Amino acid sequence: MTRRTHKGVTLIEMMVALIIMSIGLLGLAGLQAATTKYRITTMSRAAGTGLVFDLSERIRINADAAGPSFMQSGSEVASLYTIASDWTAQQKDSFSVSKNCNTAACTSSERATFDLLTWRQKVRDSMPQGGAMLSGNKRDGITVTLMWFDKEFTDGSSDATLVKAPTCNDQQTGMAQQTCCPAEAKAAEGVRCSRFSFVP
């Protein structure tokens, strides 16, 4: 009588393979969840870059309405490209345009009003509960603060409490300066800010 050796996969080897595969699939599911979590922030920041470029082009086209230039002396002319209302007030704004400067001739002042209304509508459409603040002029530079609501902006605890973005101050530099919200914005919990500056 000869003894035959068993060939093939045993049940135990099969179970080990299934366990290893299950752990791998759980890892992939976790990676997918993390990717989805950061998607809103990434998309909003990417949209913000395009929005700032759009605004800078609008201001360059209508530079006379953006305040004094380097060459001007004498009386200060305030920039018409400013937005000072806080985030909560902006959520209630309706952006009705009285004169469409794309189809009718407009003065520099009317063009600035039209530009801001249409640009603010783009901000709201591109970002969840989007808002913006603008300050400065073409001589000193324009500072743009984009604000949006991010339900994932939490403290990391198990109850996922929304946190408030840091308030801007003079001591901040680098990323802290670029992601803080101005005090005037009165940003609610869960609102993120992204700040940009440019000279038209």
Tell where the protein language model's regions lie, with residue ranges.
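Aliphatic-rich helix starts adjacent to a transmembrane/signal segment
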Residues: T2-F53
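Flexible, low-complexity segments enriched in proline/glycine/serine and punctuated by aromatic residues
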Residues: F53-P200
